[in-house]
Every structure is written in structure tokens, then in C-alpha cells.
């Protein structure tokens, strides 16, 4: 029997299952394990090719008769916030983002649990326990951070620490950008539009780090759950011919390297 190296990726295909985004359709995924010394390099390469990471697994849709899931990445240096997005930034001027190592806490899980119960109670993650959450955060062989968003306090300017946790984002640092793996927020703060705010904050962070892109995962036209990702322009969308730029007018110029 041939023994495969841990650094040599092996790809697998899942059986069909109901699509969680488009009613009446079925999904399949191709996936591989991100392990070994080259896990970071492989994650970079696969993300550029439209894969997403979940713990130590990299996956992408491989549906038989559907190509609706389109990988998108925001062009950070060219992004200009819309009027509504600027209002959201102003509304959250009292929020401080703190980058941390991927260490799960009970405070994070409390917000995560409330988020699932309010926003995704019938979703595939609805039954996640505190141990499941810990695995989601810790089980990474690539450069991963968790960014906590807290309310500013009187001592924040001195200590650099915020107060109550209102949101968090699990984020991979790639060679050409930031990849938002999963984000969640306190549902009682829904008037803040914290999901949008975290994306805007990641775009600003990518700029400061000199990274060209923020990877948002899959945009699905016609899906209420995923259509919002098309609002961050200009962006690039992965087509069979490569990454295609989409500007503010919705036009599709030449492929991008």
C-alpha cells in the first residue's frame, strides 16, 4: 500500500446533500486536509483557487449542475465605502477591535451561542456545543487570528482594552489578504449592523497590513443569506477564466491575475 506524505494533499468528493442556500438544489463539495508543514502554503494556494477553510479542512463547491457559488474578494486599496456603509462606521465609532491568538473563551461562546439561537437556529451549526466551538477556533494549522470587537470604555485609551464583547471574527492571514472564516455578533446589537462593520474593519486592516484583498467566501446571486457580499466594490469574482473585476457599475472588465 502506498503511504502518502502528510504534505501531499489528497482530494475527496462528498455525496450529494440538500443545498442550504438555494431551495430544491443539492450540493457536493471537494475537500482536502490542511495538515503538515506546508498547510499554510496550501491554504494560500487553495484560497486563491476558490476554496474555503473550516478547521483543518479546505473545501469548495463541486455541484453537478450548478455554479451559483462564486468566490469573491474585495480590492482593499480601491474600496470606497458607500453612504450607508459610512453611516455604519460612524454608528460603531465606539467599538474597538482587538486582534488575538485563536484561543476560545466562554465570553466568545456566549455571544456565538446567542447569535446562532437568534439568527441560525435551524442551520447546520445550530447544535454546536462549547467543545465544538473550541475546535472551530483552535483546529487550525495555518496563520489564524480571532478579532474581538468590544465597546470602548473610559480606560480604553490607557489600557487598549475594550469593555463588553459584542462581536468576533475568525480570520486567516494569507500571503495576499485576509480571509474571513467565520464571524458572529451579539443579536441584541442588531441596529449596529455589526456584520457589515466587521467586513469594513477587515478591509481597513488589510490596507494597514499592505495586503491587497479581503476574501469573503461565496457570493450567491439570489440568495438572501449570501447576496450581501456583492455590495463591497470594487471586488473580484472567480470565474472559469480567472478572477474577474467587478466595479461599482457592475461591469466585468478583463480578468485579473
Curated annotation (Swiss-Prot):
Q: Name one GO cellular component term.
A: cytoplasm
For this UniProt record, give its keywords in alphabetical order, as a comma-separated list. Acyltransferase, Cytoplasm, Transferase
Keyword check for Cytoplasm: yes
Where, subcellularly, is it found?
Answer: Cytoplasm
GO terms for MF:
arginyl-tRNA--protein transferase activity; leucyl-tRNA--protein transferase activity
Query: Which EC number(s) are documented for this chain?
Result: 2.3.2.29
Does the keyword field hold Transferase?
Answer: yes
Judging by the UniProt lineage, the source's domain of life is Bacteria
Question: In terms of one coarse class, where is the protein primarily found?
Answer: cytoplasm
Query: Which InterPro entries does the record match to this protein?
Result: Acyl_CoA_acyltransferase, Asp_Glu_LeuTrfase, N-end_Aminoacyl_Trfase, N-end_Aminoacyl_Trfase_C, N-end_Aminoacyl_Trfase_N
Q: Which GO terms describe its biological process?
A: ubiquitin-dependent protein catabolic process via the N-end rule pathway
Its recorded reaction(s) are: N-terminal L-glutamyl-[protein] + L-leucyl-tRNA(Leu) = N-terminal L-leucyl-L-glutamyl-[protein] + tRNA(Leu) + H(+); N-terminal L-aspartyl-[protein] + L-leucyl-tRNA(Leu) = N-terminal L-leucyl-L-aspartyl-[protein] + tRNA(Leu) + H(+)
Q: Which SUPFAM superfamilies does the entry link to?
A: Acyl-CoA N-acyltransferases (Nat)
The protein's matches in NCBIfam families, at most eight in alphabetical order, are given as: PRK01305.1-3, PRK01305.1-4, PRK01305.2-3
Summarizing the function annotation, the protein's role is: Functions in the N-end rule pathway of protein degradation where it conjugates Leu from its aminoacyl-tRNA to the N-termini of proteins containing an N-terminal aspartate or glutamate.
Per the record, the similarity remark reads: Belongs to the R-transferase family. Bpt subfamily.
The protein's name is Aspartate/glutamate leucyltransferase
